[in-house]
Amino acid sequence: TNGAVIHTQSRHATETNAPGTVRASGRIPSPGSWIGLKAHIKGLTTSANLEMHRGPIGYLGITQVEDGWHNACGLFRIDRSIKAKQADLLPAYLRKNGNHLLADQLQIADLRDDSFSAVAGFSLGNQPSTPGMMCLGDSHAIIPPFTGNGMTMAFESAEIALPHLIAYAADQFT
């Protein structure tokens, strides 16, 4: 019969040479020089709805989300001399980046318990290819910061690919 098997919430090993295989599962962990850090923080003093704090190894953006909470999200070049763990990584990277006053604010602010995340092991741009497999989204390429409208680009690209994938699954072309 025509159709597809869709695997979600898994790191299912795919057959790379199986006809019609499409990888749209996000980035493939690989050595990289960047670390992304994010947390929701209450108790920051900000002067605008969106603030950008930059330095020699990266940047941090801060924006209000709800009920006095701010989303703090940054991208930094990995520095192996930083020994901090978990939520302490964010102020440690800010200090290394020269953003000492902001790091001091983060140290005394409230951190939403389940909001901290760190992502490392990625490179920007084209990702390693897998022969015999079509890759979409971050599994194909990771756009650089400040490109703008990243999620819009992702949804529009998926919309372009979808009719072709449906036609292939229905044996309308090979």
Briefly describe each language-model feature range:
Residues 20-99:
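Conserved FAD-binding catalytic core of PHBH/FMO-like flavoproteins
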Residues 82-161:
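FAD/FMN-dependent oxidoreductases across multiple families
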